[in-house]
Amino acid sequence: LFLIHKMAFWGGEDMVRAKDYTWQKSRYTLLKGRWGIAIWIEAGYLMTSEIEDKNNYTEISDHIYFESMIPSSSDNIQLYADELLHFCSGLKMISRHFHEFLPEGMYLIIALRNIEFSECYVQIEGFTACAIQWASEAFHFSMPKIEAYFDESKAPNGQYIFDFSSV
């Protein structure tokens, strides 16, 4: 029933494209302070020999592109532009791993089709870390070390401080 709803909403062409992707679910969690971050995503990748219109995608690096496939409806959480930028930033940080996986002359498209999180317990850098974790799981490389600590002095409820320098 859920798949039928998605098919009807996405339309035939989007559903056919989505079937070609290799999908992977991932859950990023961080709990080191008074509150935690939890982000669940489903993202996928597709290798292709050509991309018809690169303007429909965000370029991550040479031959690697991103697109959001999150259906726009009241049932789905939508990411703001800055949240998508942070997600893509995570993919850019580890793009060298994609190039190891990608055959020469091919393109890699990464798509995000579902995301869930509590707007009360999320911080924008969490989207960066979430993208890195998803990629490490989907492409089977070791999760890079992301340092994070909770700074209770940041008003009003504390803030996580992330260090991506070792990524």
Language model features: what each stretch is:
Residues 2-167:
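Accessory interaction regions appended to the cores of large information-processing enzymes
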